[in-house]
């Protein structure tokens, strides 16, 4: 289980994002909490590119634009930074994924939109940045138990969403495959995460769309 102090620190940290600020505070400029939110976005980039173990505290202070003292005031250690970063990344990516699959009429179309969500992030510059969850999952055996729990939770959460899309498609008849939704979701997730890995090697969007086309045959 996660260290209680880490959980409490993260909840307190994230709750600051929604706190209202007085006109005087807004007039003085952007509050510190929002600077820390931006700092976590910097941490997402460096952890995604370098991985947990290869990222030093110096890398984090540079990416987050924080002095080392400020970093340790906000977070207990590098592990706490990573856990907070992973949680922020998971929340943001879930919202973006759900938005990407919304608005389509059938489960099949929503499933394809989910695959395209990954294809569009697996080429060019954004592809070379990598995916925080995929990178951490690949390094899971070398991570400690607290971090492994966070990574596993992120992977399983995405798998549940994909399984829901499969089930919706089977219900409306657009997904003709009779495979168990959970099994098909795992296969699709392997394709999605695989695109993020291959995308780090400099592939084109056309390459990734071809993967989507093949993956969707599993649903036919």
What do the predicted segments below correspond to?
Residues 1-34:
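N-terminal intrinsically disordered/low-complexity leader segments
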Residues 17, 129, 134, 178-198, ...:
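Hydrophobic alpha-helical segments that form the core
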Residues 38, 42-80, 84:
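Helix-turn-helix
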Residues 84, 98-129, 181-188:
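Hydrophobic alpha-helical connector segments
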Residues 91-94, 109-113, 145-171, 182-183:
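Amphipathic alpha-helical packing segments from all-alpha helical-bundle domains
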Residues 121-124, 164, 168, 188-206, ...:
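Amphipathic C-terminal alpha-helical segment
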């Amino acid at each position: 289980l996660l260290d209680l102090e880490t959980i409490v620190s993260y909840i307190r940290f994230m709750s600051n994002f929604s706190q209202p600020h007085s006109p005087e505070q807004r007039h003085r400029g952007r509050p510190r909490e929002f600077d820390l939110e931006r700092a976590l976005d910097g941490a997402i980039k460096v952890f995604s590119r370098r991985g947990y173990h290869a990222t030093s505290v110096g890398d984090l202070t540079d990416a987050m634009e924080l002095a080392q003292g400020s970093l340790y005031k906000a977070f207990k250690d590098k592990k706490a930074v990573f856990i907070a970063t992973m949680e922020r990344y998971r929340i943001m990516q879930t919202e973006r994924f759900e938005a990407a699959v919304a608005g389509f009429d059938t489960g099949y179309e929503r499933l394809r939109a989910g695959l395209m969500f990954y294809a569009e992030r697996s080429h060019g510059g954004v592809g070379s940045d990598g995916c925080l969850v995929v990178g951490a999952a690949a390094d899971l055996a070398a991570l400690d138990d607290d971090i492994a729990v966070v990574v596993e939770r992120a992977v399983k959460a995405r798998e549940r969403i994909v399984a829901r899309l499969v089930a919706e498609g089977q219900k409306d008849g657009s997904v003709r495959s009779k495979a168990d939704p959970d099994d098909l979701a795992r296969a699709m997730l392997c394709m999605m995460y695989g695109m993020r890995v291959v995308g780090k090697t400099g592939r084109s969007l056309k390459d990734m769309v071809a993967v989507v086309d093949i993956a969707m045959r599993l649903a036919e």
